[in-house]
Amino acid sequence: MEEKDYFEFLQVAVGNRKSLSVRVSDADWHRLFEFCKRQALIGVGFTAVEKLHAVGVVCPAALRMQWMALALQIERRNDLLNEQCSQLAGRYEHDGLSTCILKGQGNCLNYPEELRNRRQCGDIDVWTVPFENEECRLKKQRSAAEGKANEECSEADGGVAIAVQTGKEDVEYVEYHGRKAVIEYVRMQHRLVGSNVSPIIRYHHIEAPKIDGTEVEVHFRPCYAHSPLKNWRMQRWFKDHADVCMKNKTHMGFAVPTASVNVVYQMCHLFSHYFDEGLGLRQLMDYYFALRVWHNDVMECKDLQSQGMWSEGLGTQVLSKEEVMAVLRSFGMGKFAGAVMYVLHEVFAISSHYYICAPNEKEGKKLLEEIMKGGNFGQYDTRDAGMKRGGMIKHGLWKLKRVLRLVRSYPEEALWEPVFRVWHLGWRLMNG
């Protein structure tokens, strides 16, 4: 099979094509299965199997049964994670922390009904902010709207009380604020489940105790950039938009990013993984559906504006594609956004009216080549496999070699990556 035939199969799954343009042999069906496996699209791929079966393009029975069994497992797993996200959000909010589910389960509602529970899920990523920070931002927003100087929020405005170990019989509490409150809260959760192991902490998240075997990453920063200037802009932008995301509740019992924030956040997520271990088509499919939902909000917003109204979530203005691109360019991702548009067009046959910018064919071909070689998060990339799976030094050299491939395309982010990695090692030693 040619590469385009695999893409046509995915286009059938997402509803952009009725059938395939080539005859599919039994061997080809097995190739399609392996392709979906590499890209973590088994569940979505089975939807294409069902649609093709309805038009007379039949998958071998044994493979179809195997495929269906895996799709059912994915559906049950999604139901479980949705329930766990709801429970986690309720517990954290009871304890004084606002939450917003990112990535995996945060993307499910963007998918159409027939695909929603067939998205292959992994762990739970939750963006967490103490209530005090949210209230402070609202104060500042009200001040800005009234043309006053920003109201400053002191620690007296609130905090999160964390039980600490003192060696005494009575429990003592210390009040923490901001990022420190999130970190100490998660550490307390580890103590409550009897874990003496220090949780792994990184610049943007800390690993919380598992929920019935499901890994949980608690983000005090939703994402980051290697360049100090771009990272400063990114952190400021997401801080300004945190409150509306925390309040964007769904019928599932947890909040997700608003459509406008998500179309920015998901691009940052893609860019980060492009520099890290690699990207897969599952992440690109997430962005495909995020774009469609955002575009529908923009169209609805235009209708409301004609009536003198605008809204998203709780009254937050919907970002136009020009505004989205202005934000992404300020993060150094303008060229990458064009590459993503190219991949979405080639793989999913996305309509041009969903574009946030013109496709960049040159960078898009590079991105698509990386995706096809590496599979989901680069797990199937055989280039320099010995270095990748070696010790700390070998892995560091592998990562440097990978980043150097991107220097010509994204020089600022690529050249800052080794510097950030060294700095981050020191940061983890100080904060771990």
Label every PLM stretch briefly.
Residues 146-147:
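Residue-level signal for mature regions of secreted extracellular proteins and peptides
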Residues 1-122, 128-133, 151-152, 157, ...:
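Conserved NTP-donor binding/palm subdomain of two-metal-ion nucleotidyltransferases/polymerases, i.e.
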Residues 141, 300-305:
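Intrinsically disordered, low-complexity linker and terminal tail regions
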